[in-house]
Amino acid sequence: MSIEIRKLSHIYNEGTTFASVALDAIDLTIQEYCMTAIIGETGSGKSTLVQHLNALLLPSKGEIQINDRIIKADEKPKQLKALRKKVGLVFQFPEYQLFEETILKDVSFGPKNFGASEEEAEQRAKEVLKVVGLDESYYEKSPFECSGGEKRRVAIAGILAMD
């Protein structure tokens, strides 16, 4: 899946005296199968940019093309559910994404939320936990009992399980 960002601008509180430009005419291409990191100073717009990649935020101006899908300011949130299945995000502190009582439940949450059966979600969770190096001894463990690195792997597995 390739991502093309064209002239993307985002203005918080647009049309008010509190308007603040977070992104101003950004152009960016992310090629298919390319892992990309967004880095920069505090307040530089990293989080705002990343939230546009799966339409958590919509552009004030410009557009984002993900494969054949073009996202503009006038999108309806219900039309974006399929897109959110395809674009997964892992934030700087992915362990903050963890919330279920066991690792297996946490990694299964995404697939279930997007319509997979309990069995399908659990099978997918087990597959991706293996990929990130967490064997069955982790399934019933609380994510909060894990080391920082293990928490990150659980969070990454949760994103991968949605594929």
Please identify what each model-predicted range represents.
Residues 2, 11-25, 75-79:
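A short, flexible loop at the N-terminus of ABC-type nucleotide-binding domains that lies
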Residues 156:
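Hydrophobic anchor residue at the start of the ABC signature
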